[in-house]
Amino acid sequence: MNGMKRGGCRAIELLLMLLFAAGALLAQAPTGPLPPKPGVPVQQPPKNEIKVQVALVTTPVTVRDSHGDMVHSLDAKDFRVTDNGAAQKISHFDLGGDPISLVILVETSSRIEPLAPEIRKTGILFTQTVMGPTGEAAVVGLNDSVDKLQDFTSSADQIENTIANLRIGSSGLKLFDAMAVGVEMLTSRPQATTEKPGRRRVMLVLSEGMDEGSEKQLGEVLRQAQLANVTIYGVGLSTTRAELQAKPKPPQPPNLPVGSVPPPPGVPATPTYEDNYRYGGADLMAAVIWAVQHIHDKVKGNPLEVAAVATGGAQLSTFKDRSIENAIDEIGGELHSQYTLSYTPTEPDTTGYHEIKVSVIRNDAKNLKIRARPGYYLAPPES
């Protein structure tokens, strides 16, 4: 009996020793992946690249004859569109009929306060001339802040009341931040697809065209506007004109308005002189391409002009004979007499700048003047 007990104890001791040895081996085993052998390359897991493709490109096309009158007699077969030199198939064609989604950006800085009464009267022009019967609009005010004053609505009364009650704020002007907000708002509106028409996305900016203190840069805004098929129009407000319209004030020591440029002796202080001085007469097309390629850098050139050229719109000055009302009326007339062409790019994921060219291939097209958006920039994939 004692022998059996001693045998059982030895068996238990042996079992405990085996369990202890197994635990020690497990404790020494690596918990992570095995290190690579010397000279053997490590295979990395594939990166999740975020690829951006352009599903549909839409460009406004304005066609005028030699007298400057709009041409309304063209069909889709009369146009040729190329993207980086490759001919594209037009999938959607329209002449002024697609409904408009409009963002109205209005400068409300104290610098243009003398022009405020004129601006407050423009509401009916936006609703009757620009929006049209099927349009919708939103209103954004900008000074040193960006304020959404009215979300998208088709109510003419709401738009007109919002503009009639604009309040003047500080002297700041965050133009680029306001434009970025406008592009974001328009991106939410349905646009055309290959199966059905959509809304034309239009931004109309009433401003001096200067920027002070924005977090965004113009190139960043324009890149997004191009990819979202947003067309930008500008109505340039003149601080010189505002000063001339201001009520006389008691004599004070000379104090130049913020942003003005003193001309040399004998040169009148016109906006043309100030623009040339401030922006160096930059080539607009070169400025557009440079801007969308260098989105974190400042852009030379009048921002409203550069934005209009980049997106197929137009920028109208109001310094001389053209009033603010006339400028808005001209833009409305153009929008409803303008062609809209859409296509799906044959190489939708080719990165870099895509140059768009639109031409009229009719025999009598020699003297026609065509304006369309010049292109868009597709950034490389993000990892």
Language model features: what each stretch is:
Residues 1-9:
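N-terminal secretory signal peptides that target proteins for export/translocation
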Residues 13-24:
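Bacterial N-terminal signal peptides
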Residues 27-383:
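Scaffold/interface architecture of coatomer-like assemblies
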